[in-house]
Each structure stands twice: as structure tokens, then as C-alpha cells.
């Protein structure tokens, strides 16, 4: 069974599986069906449920340890300490890190220390180059894969891992799986071409990238 739900849809499905005796080991969720709110209320009843994971979780990464040490241990945390390092918390950290790195990347081209415009930050977002060495230096070891973005590729990565709920926390697998771009790229191109045509947009040229 593939869960494609959002919010309470997932925990409801897992509770029904428990009630009917359907093996949770045979249930797989898309990445947005694989966070703590989806399984926490079901607890042991969701044990064995699998879900795709775009990012790691847990309190082991250095970036998470720094937040615990410099924020929560000093009594300056504004949210529950036990949520630090959860799937959604970590995803939020990644988003903020990418935003900062986009500004940093833009400043490399347009002037270090200067205030960047929206267009300049867009260039930074479209020219990210985060290799493993950089991710480790930022404290995001084992959190995400290296990524490189471009004007034509805003995603930068099409890889994910599979995580399994053990009744209390997520156990993430070591193997990464890549989406089949031979299937996805034509679909993305067709969708973007239609959107551009419907909205009467002009295609960006290389100079704008």
C-alpha cells in the first residue's frame, strides 16, 4: 500500500491498518507522508511502516548539536527541545541553510558584504554548489546529499532514502535511490512548456542565468 496522504490522513490509514491486521511493513509513504506527526500518535502500532526521506533526522549532526548547545542548553529555545532534529525541523534547517548559502554564493559574484537584490539571490539559488566537504563544514553530515543547481535544474538532486518507523523514532536506510529522470524530465519539460504558453511567458536566455 502506498500512502500519498497529508496530515491526519496518514495516521488514520496506519490506525486502520493496525485495526484490520494489515502489515505495516507492506506500507510505504511518499516523502510528505514520512514525518513524526504521521506516526507519533500511532506509536508502536505504526512500527515497520516505511517512507521516503529526502533528508535525515535525529540529533547526531553537528548543526543539530550546535542548536542544542548554543540555544536550548542556554534556555533560549522557543520550541520543544525534543523536536530538535525531527524530520520537519531538520527540513526547515536545510531550507534556511540553502537560503543563507544562496546569498553567500550571490555575494561571491556581485560583491561580498553587499546587500543582495532579489534577482541576485535568485542567481545564487540557481548556482549552488554544495559538495560533501562543504556540507560537512556546515554541520549537515549525513543529513542530505551534495547538490548542484543551475538555471535549468532548480532541484539539484533527485535522490532519496527509505526510513522505517521503529515505534519511537525513524531508522533511516544507508542506500540512496535516484528517481528515473528518463521518465521525469519529459514530463517536467512538457508541463513547463504548457505553463509558459498558457501564461504567455518569455523563455529566459543564457545571459539571464
Which functions belong to the PLM regions below?
Residues 78-89, 100-174:
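Segments of small-molecule ligand-sensing domains
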Residues 5, 29-33, 53, 164-166, ...:
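Active-site proximal loops enriched in glycine and acidic residues that flank catalytic Cys/His/Asp
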Residues 17-96, 191:
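Extracellular/periplasmic periplasmic-binding protein-like sensory domains
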Residues 1-20, 95-102:
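Hydrophobic alpha-helical
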Residues 6-9, 63, 91-99, 158, ...:
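Catalytic-loop motifs flanking and including active-site residues across diverse enzymes
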Residues 120, 125-133, 164-209:
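Conserved C-terminal helix/tail region of periplasmic/extracytoplasmic solute-binding proteins
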